[in-house]
């Protein structure tokens, strides 16, 4: 955020949250800052919206008992639904707002050729995503990309419960726009 303000660039980060009788959710998404990701500020907002929508749907439609009977399967289905909704949002936005020449002039030659042909346009919207949810019966975190999800227990001890991804190193990260996004998602859950 601060460097974007200093350099006069658009901040590509987004966040969302909600809390109701079912649970509490916090979501953050970091748009990719590279030149080829000219719509990542839009993509990060879409990622947050997709996560909130689908976590809310999970809370409303899946009982705690059903979730806890197969938590890994439930979280993989949640991650798949988020990816699907994000891709649908990207496609709808792109169809209503094709790339401008100004946007295409900013990207690499390779990305420009791809975007002009309508191929892999979702890369322009690329973003990471971290979401954490707490209910009375369980809590979980899901993540794709770099960044850290920190959790504090009642004693104030901090942990990072979502497993780290070795593919996220230095300037490299996995992304919701990746062709292996579902495989690249990772998660954690607990009853405590």
Set out the residue ranges of the language-model regions.
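PP2C/PPM-type serine/threonine phosphatase catalytic domain
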Residues: 1-192
